[in-house]
Design a protein with these regions (language model features):
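Extreme N-terminal starter segment of soluble prokaryotic enzymes
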Residues: 1-4
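Short polar catalytic/cofactor-binding loops
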Residues: 7-14
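Short, glycine/acidic-enriched loop or turn micro-motifs at the edges of active sites
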Residues: 11, 34, 171
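Catalytic domains of carbohydrate-active enzymes, especially glycoside hydrolases
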Residues: 16-38, 104-107
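Glycine-rich, proline-tolerant flexible connector loops at the mouths of alpha/beta enzymes
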Residues: 32-58, 115-119
Length: 180
């Protein structure tokens, strides 16, 4: 078993300093945030996918410290009821897939997302019970949105060689435990 860490815990450090620090602690693998809530402190796919020199510098820095990248992490809410926010999170997640493809990884880590309770919602609505009946109706609506989104996203990921999508089970999102 190898020890790994999400690099965003030291997002205030440049990537090289972060990797040097992790190496000194015996860390062997890193999960690198590249959008959404983790931010892009150590990996900005929009830059690295289009600037070969910066991409090579990124790769060389990881290699210099003999680190393995376990996954690119892009936790957001691509089904947020605010369409602008949803589009931004979706773009980050798709860029994470493209970054994984370029780097030769087959996995990204993310959240499932959580829609609102109806088409006119402005904020996510995290429902954790199916009764009284109103909640069951909300869950039906939400899971339709969730499944439709993920069918499309999984197809995109597969087209780009990403065959593992790890959903972090987290409160506030539709997938928050093993039963969901």
């Amino acid at each position: 078993m190898k020890l790994g860490v999400l690099t965003n815990v030291v997002g205030n450090m440049p990537l090289e300093d972060a990797l040097k620090y992790f190496k000194s602690m015996g860390i062997q693998m890193v999960e690198i945030g590249c959008g959404g809530y983790p931010g892009k402190d150590h990996c900005d796919p929009e830059v690295l996918l289009h600037d070969e020199a910066k991409y090579q510098e990124f790769c060389d820095t990881i290699k210099k410290y003999d680190m393995e990248v376990s996954a690119f992490s892009c936790h957001g809410n691509p089904i947020h009821p605010n369409k602008e926010l949803a589009a931004a999170y979706d773009k980050d997640m798709r860029n994470a897939v493209l970054m994984a493809e370029k780097y030769g990884l087959h996995q990204i880590n993310c959240f499932s997302g959580c829609p609102g309770d109806c088409e006119t919602s402005q904020y996510p609505n995290w429902v954790v019970c199916a009764w009284p009946d109103d909640f069951g109706k909300i869950l039906e609506y939400q899971w339709k949105i969730l499944v439709d989104y993920w069918k499309d996203f999984v197809a995109f990921a597969r087209e780009h060689g990403v065959n593992k999508i790890a959903l972090e089970m987290h409160q506030g999102f539709c997938v928050y435990n093993t039963e969901t």
